[in-house]
Curated annotation (Swiss-Prot):
Keywords: Cytoplasm, Golgi apparatus, Nucleus, Phosphoprotein, Protein transport, Repeat, Transport
Protein name: Amyloid-beta A4 precursor protein-binding family A member 1
Residue segments, region Disordered: 1-118, 235-346, 362-437
Record's compositionally biased regions (Low complexity): 401-417
Mutation effect (Y633E): Enhanced APP binding and amyloid-beta production
Biased composition (Basic and acidic residues): 103-112, 237-255, 389-400
Tissues and organs where the protein is expressed, per its UniProt entry: Brain. Detected in the cerebellum, hippocampus, olfactory system, piriform and entorhinal cortex, supraoptic nucleus of the hypothalamus, substantia nigra, and other mesencephalic areas.
Residues with the Phosphothreonine modification: T306, T372
Positions of the UniProt region annotated as LIN-2/CASK binding: 375-438
């Protein structure tokens, strides 16, 4: 690379005056500490020629012993720095702040191909583990700006000595480099594969004592390792803190950019970066152990230079293929190195596995690796495409705009009109991602009444029709069905009038004089389109959600679509301050009139399309349509005995009779009445108690529990309790009273059939008393009545049972549920909890 053939001064001189670290990829990644320390100083003049150390063959004066030892350590550290810079460039994700320099980097590599073996770096003692060590230093190069001053591996005053010893380097690179059109792959996915590095010895470099250099390097590395361990723990804690509630708000998710910037690299590191640091720490510990255990002879062999590899008179000879990975091929050294390498790799792999598991536990799904590609945007309604329970959800049709997929079975002119999400809307994206996972687990479709197959309605169906014309009407927001039908009839009347005027060559009203045209009426769960039968060009296109009403009148079909009228700003301000004005808002209705022999089928198909679209909506939101199937619930209701055979009981003549009560004038009847309870088939009053020795009791014709239908010809059915009491009190001056009653036991028997827990019972209980009831549910069908106290459930008395236990019994009861109830007021009277008030 051209700009790396010189010394460090060349790289500093090439920087922008502002100190921006973006002039050169290698300058940014290989010498961050040089750039940081050079920033305060003024830049050199533009015409300043950088020094070329190769132009001065005289070696530099020997430094003092202590400086010489530091210099040797810095040289070894330079080896690590250059390698980490190389990997920092190759591992940069697409779209990163350094990606702009990539083309220049490729061009420089191509130009320097001829000088590939002219320069090299000295072989490091840990060459056996070089591959893993270099990748681990990826993190170190980016973090050295944040290291304390005493932890910097080399300072600015040592740059000249280092550059005198190392004037350049050449790599043969195959690491994670891919073309634009190649599929994405994680940078470390093929770790351990073929990695070629060409090393040559620099002949005129000063002789270094490898043992002293290794000792210095190990001491500095231990200090850096301790710092990295602290940073690693802080980052793990940072992940844990960011994990709590991240998916709750889009604002928090927006804080975490997909690709980290270099100035915030330490705060947004991903799992691979942390694992790389653990690799380096483990590798360093393994190297220490290896250095202590290996004999001196083997260490000397490992540190020996490559024979014949770098003499000045043969700079163009590349290293042999067998020496690209190992410089010394001594059998003894190879076996020892392989043994230590295998032990180290086993330990590292176990540690990496533990670290990844720990990180995954504290990391939420919103924390992504910077190398992970952006997920594709998903539609608001995830339209199902041939999904079976065994098929994976990832086989969904991709969002391609409005064009159908090539393999779609949609008819000619059909569109898949899928509305894409707003870009950058993580909340809807997170919600739809979860709904997609649940789609395939649901059955294909719940049966929807209609003439079409639900699958066909998703793709779209076509009916042939004649387009008669269109007209406009003003309508309220939610008119009744009768009003809708009147509007449809008015639209048909207008169109027929316009046709008659056109035939008589008279001027028709503007917008209504349209000739009859043969069209194809396209119907799907997304939209309704009117296509020209000859050209298949769309004449009209309405989203299904805008269709307000469909009517078939003979062979005429009226399709009404809603459009909001434009309003002035003053109207909008009034409606904003008075929300009740929204109900009075006028809507412009576009009424299209068609003529077809299949008018009824067209209307039914559009209605069925709404039902299928609703099922799609449920599926997209993770709800099984079977749970809300109206047909299934209707079938369940049909299995219930209506009011537990109350109709049969009330219709039997022997249970309904007239009773005459004789009494003295001024004497009360001597009864206590209560309401039969809302939910009974005939709401009236029930005799709850009778006065001892009173006219009612002495007659022997009345019993507790009898329902009074009428008194002296006045019906009590449906009247309030207070009104019924007033009527009975008015009998005080009469000597003979006629009552029409229905014999009923004081205790009501309830039978509820509940096949599955997913069906709610449809009533609520408070302290054993039924306080509310869902109209039309299985409980009402079974005879449950509001105001009744539950006496028994499935043969078990619950009179003295706590409320919580009663609720638990009812919530978990399935199959046939038998209950016995009575009016709560009657229960209190019979148990002497209340004193009766006779009338």
């Amino acid at each position: 690379m051209n700009h790396l053939e010189g010394s460090a001064e060349v790289e500093v001189a090439d920087e922008a005056p502002g100190g921006e670290v973006n002039e050169s990829v290698e300058a940014d990644l290989e010498h961050p500490e040089v750039e940081e320390e050079q920033q305060p100083s003024p830049p050199p003049p533009a015409g300043h020629a950088p020094e070329d150390h190769r132009a001065h063959p005289a070696p530099p004066p020997p430094p003092p012993p202590q400086e010489e030892e530091e210099e040797r350590g810095e040289c070894l550290a330079r080896s690590a720095s250059t390698e980490s810079g190389f990997h920092n460039h190759t591992d940069t994700a697409e779209g990163d702040v350094l990606a702009a320099a990539r083309d220049g980097y490729e061009a420089e590599r191509a130009q320097d191909a001829d000088d590939e073996s002219a320069y090299a770096v000295q072989y490091r003692p840990e060459a056996e583990e070089y591959t893993e060590q270099a990748e681990a230093e990826h993190a170190e190069a980016a973090q050295r700006r944040a290291l304390p001053n005493h932890l910097h591996f080399h300072s600015l005053e040592h740059e000249e000595a280092m550059n005198a010893a190392y004037s350049g380097y050449v790599y043969t690179h195959r690491l994670f480099h891919r073309a634009e059109d190649e599929p994405y792959a994680e940078p470390y996915a093929d770790y351990g594969g073929l990695q070629e590095h060409v090393y040559e010895e620099i002949g005129d470099a000063p002789e270094l004592e490898a043992r002293d250099g290794l000792r210095l390097y190990e001491r500095e590395r231990d200090e850096a390792a301790a710092y990295r361990q602290e940073a690693l723990g802080a980052r793990l804690h940072h992940y844990d803190e960011r994990s709590d509630g991240e998916s709750d708000s889009p604002e928090k998710e927006a804080e975490f950019a997909p690709y980290p910037r270099m100035d915030s690299y330490e705060q947004e590191e991903d799992i691979d970066q942390i694992v790389a640091e653990v690799k380096q720490s483990m590798s360093s510990q393994s190297l220490d152990k290896a250095a202590e255990d290996m004999p001196e002879a083997e260490q000397d062999l490992e540190r020996a230079p490559t024979p014949g590899g770098g003499h000045p008179d043969s700079p163009g000879l590349p290293a042999p293929a067998g020496q690209q990975q190992r410089v010394v091929g001594t059998p003894g050294g190879s076996e020892v190195g392989q043994r230590y390498s295998k032990e180290k790799r086993d330990a590292i792999s176990l540690a990496i596995k533990d670290i990844k598991e720990a990180i995954e536990e504290v990391k939420t799904r919103t924390i992504r690796s910077p190398y992970t590609p952006d997920e594709p945007k998903e539609p608001i309604w995830v339209m199902r495409q041939d999904i079976s329970p065994t098929r994976d959800c990832d086989d969904q049709r991709p969002v391609d705009g409005d064009s159908p997929s090539p393999g779609s079975s949609s008819p000619l002119g059909a569109e898949s009109s899928i509305t894409p999400l707003h870009p950058g809307d993580p909340t809807e994206a997170s919600t739809n991602k979860e709904s997609r996972k649940s789609l395939a687990s649901f059955p294909t479709y719940v049966e929807v009444p209609g003439p079409c197959d639900p699958e066909d309605l998703i793709d779209g169906i076509i009916f042939a029709a004649n387009y008669l014309g269109s007209t406009q009407l003003l309508s309220d927001k939610t008119p009744s069905k009768n009003v809708r039908m009147m509007q449809a009839q008015e639209a048909v009347s207008r169109i027929k009038t316009a046709q008659k005027l056109a035939k008589s060559r008279k001027k028709a009203p503007e917008g209504e004089s349209q000739p009859m045209t043969e069209v194809d009426l396209f119907i799907s769960t997304q939209r309704i389109k009117v296509l020209n039968a000859d050209t298949q060009e769309p004449m009209m296109d309405h989203p299904l959600r805008t269709i307000s009403y469909i009517a078939d009148i003979g062979n005429i079909v009226v399709l009404m679509a809603r459009r909001r009228m434009p309003r002035s700003n003053s109207q909008e301000n009034v409606e904003a301050s008075h929300p009740s004005q929204d109900a009075k808002r006028q809507y412009k209705m576009i009424c299209h009139v068609f003529e077809s022999e299949d008018a009824q089928l067209i209307a039914q198909s559009i209605g069925q399309a709404f039902s299928v679209a609703y099922q799609e909506f449920l599926r997209a939101n993770g709800i099984n349509p079977e749970d809300l199937s109206q047909k299934e619930y209707s079938d369940l209701l049909n299995t219930q005995d209506m009011y537990n055979d109350d109709l049969i009981h009330f219709s039997k003549s022997e249970n309904c009779k007239d009773v005459f009560i004789e009494k003295q004038k001024g004497e009360i009847l001597g009864v206590v009445i209560v309401e039969s309870g809302w939910g009974s088939i005939l709401p009236t009053v029930i005799i709850a108690n009778m006065m001892h020795g009173g006219p009612a009791e002495k007659s022997g014709k009345l019993n507790i529990g009898d329902q009074i239908m009428s008194i002296n010809g006045t019906s009590l059915v449906g009247l309030p309790l207070s009104t019924c009491q007033s009527i009975i009190k008015g009998l005080k001056n009469q000597s003979r009273v006629k009552l029409n009653i229905v014999r009923c036991p004081p205790v009501t028997t309830v039978l509820i059939r509940r096949p599955d827990l997913r069906y709610q019972l449809g009533f609520s209980v408070q302290n054993g008393i039924i306080c509310s009831l869902m109209r039309g549910g299985i409980a009402e069908r079974g005879g449950v009545r509001v105001g009744h106290r539950i006496i028994e459930i499935n043969g078990q008395s619950v009179v003295a049972t706590p409320h919580e236990k009663i609720v638990h019994i009812l919530s978990n009861a399935v199959g046939e549920i038998h209950m016995k109830t009575m009016p709560a007021a009657m229960y209190r009277l019979l148990t002497a909890q209340e004193q009766p008030v006779y009338i």
